[in-house]
């Protein structure tokens, strides 16, 4: 008997889901990019072979989006004239020594057949780009400007240096960043992409439920990390979609805490922000759990405020609705909830900031709610865990093909009060809320779920328990052994 995987899934195989993004879809993406560029030369760099610690290879997302090529040290060059592109993939040829280290890689015939892309050797790339630079066409780069691999000496995998050197050899060459165009294309997810996000989310939900069944006082954060990441791999994920954040007690209020070393103490909550990647597509789920299986009165109250804020955003996340309406509705609900708990003076009360200019950033910059609600509540999902969504562009509304999260949080810690300047207004505020802050001190609550905008409207797909009673029921059914 195969645990937790249906026979039907095993018969279909993981490769079937990966293959849902067809060569024709990759070609259509390149065609869309070509149409927007008109005339120019696109050069997109893939990720490099890890050479320092022999870690896992990660393909750069823009390159993967346009090619589907999953091997290292490659580049796509596409000559675009009149809105029509002619692509070529530059790849390292497999050698016996390279195969010994990294396994066999496809030959040019296999690439042409499987990806519908003609190929040349990576060694030919500099000369090819020099020739194209002399045509006078502008260069549109998708280089690894934000990747942490600048120490590599190979100019192919070090895209930033390659583009810089190309421009230096050809004075007057026009160089443009193609990322804004590609990001806008990536924002609308195809049915095949949504299927991969669904699968990544399904695996992640099972991981969270496995963790709920096994977490108990006396464990450490790394025990929970091991349980959930094991469940991800067992479910078919390539890896976690990002560094797992497992923070209990005071660490629950550290947004990107990743040490995952602390103990799980009775009476505390633990934030579990962890999810899987499948077929190159990421998802993102967070739950906040009671270590001993039951929320305290204060934890329940604060948790419900966060959950209500999430529900408000859900009601305002529909095709054609403004992303700002979702954000505003969530913060309004949380502000009223915080006021009812005595953690702020009123839903619209303000404070004096450390620097007066802080109040001009957003209409809510100096509202007291922003001391405890300290981050945004949505981002896209896709080839990156923070992927673009269509609401980032144009009229800023949700549209069919969006994949995104809603992740409100509240984090109560006295350090937020300590950063306020000593003014009469702030002294009065702190005096009024100090007792409540002490009661809720070191309580961090975040709930994060995954949603799709489809022809049916909003669809919630990360269906791990999230209501208080559901979570406590899961803890009552927990077991100990890991299968």
Regions found by a protein language model. Give the residues of each.
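General helical secondary-structure elements
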Residues: 1, 14, 25-26
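Active-site neighborhoods and metal-handling regions in enzymes and metal-associated proteins
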Residues: 18-483
């Amino acid at each position: 008997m195969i645990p937790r995987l249906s026979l039907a899934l095993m018969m279909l195989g993981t490769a079937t889901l990966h293959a849902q993004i067809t060569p024709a879809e990759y070609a259509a993406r390149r065609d869309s990019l070509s149409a927007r560029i008109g005339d120019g030369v696109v050069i997109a760099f893939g990720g490099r072979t890890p050479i320092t610690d022999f870690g896992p290879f990660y393909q750069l997302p823009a390159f993967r989006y346009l090619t589907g090529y999953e091997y290292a040290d490659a580049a796509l060059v596409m000559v675009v004239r009149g809105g029509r592109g002619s692509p070529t993939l530059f790849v390292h040829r497999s050698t016996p020594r390279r195969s010994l280290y990294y396994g066999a890689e496809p030959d040019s015939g296999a690439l042409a057949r499987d990806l519908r892309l003609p190929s040349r050797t990576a060694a030919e790339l500099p000369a090819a780009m020099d020739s194209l630079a002399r045509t006078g066409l502008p260069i549109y780069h998708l280089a690894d400007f934000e990747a942490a691999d600048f120490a590599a000496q190979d100019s192919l995998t070090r895209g930033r240096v390659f583009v810089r050197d190309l421009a230096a050899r050809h004075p007057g060459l026009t160089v443009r960043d193609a990322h804004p165009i590609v990001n806008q294309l990536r924002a609308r997810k195809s049915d095949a992409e949504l299927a991969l996000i669904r699968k990544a989310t399904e695996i992640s939900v099972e991981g969270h439920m496995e963790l709920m069944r096994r977490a108990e006082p006396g464990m450490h954060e790394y025990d929970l990390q091991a349980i959930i990441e094991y469940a991800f791999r067992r479910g078919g994920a390539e890896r976690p979609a990002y560094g797992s954040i497992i923070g209990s007690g005071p660490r629950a209020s550290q947004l990107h805490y990743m040490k995952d070393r602390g103990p799980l103490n009775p009476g505390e909550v633990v934030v579990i922000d962890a999810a899987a990647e499948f077929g190159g597509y990421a998802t993102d789920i967070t739950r906040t759990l009671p270590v001993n299986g039951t929320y305290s009165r204060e934890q329940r109250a604060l948790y419900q405020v966060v959950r209500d804020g999430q529900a408000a955003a859900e009601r305002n996340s529909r095709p054609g609705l403004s992303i700002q309406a979702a954000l505003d509705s969530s913060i309004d609900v949380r502000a009223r909830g915080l006021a009812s708990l005595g953690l702020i003076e009123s839903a619209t009360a303000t404070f004096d900031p450390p620097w007066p200019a802080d109040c001009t950033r957003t209409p809510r910059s100096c509202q007291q709610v922003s001391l405890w609600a300290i981050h945004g509540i949505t981002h896209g999902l896709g080839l990156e865990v923070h992927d673009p969504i269509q609401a980032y562009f144009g009229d800023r509304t949700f549209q069919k093909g969006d994949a995104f999260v809603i992740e409100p949080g509240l984090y109560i810690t006295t350090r937020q009060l300590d950063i306020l300047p000593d003014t009469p207004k702030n002294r009065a505020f702190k005096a009024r809320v100090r007792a409540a802050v002490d009661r809720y001190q070191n309580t961090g609550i975040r709930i994060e779920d995954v949603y799709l905008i489809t022809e049916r409207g909003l669809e919630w797909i990360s269906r791990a328990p999230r209501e208080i009673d559901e979570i406590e029921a899961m803890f009552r059914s927990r077991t100990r052994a890991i299968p």
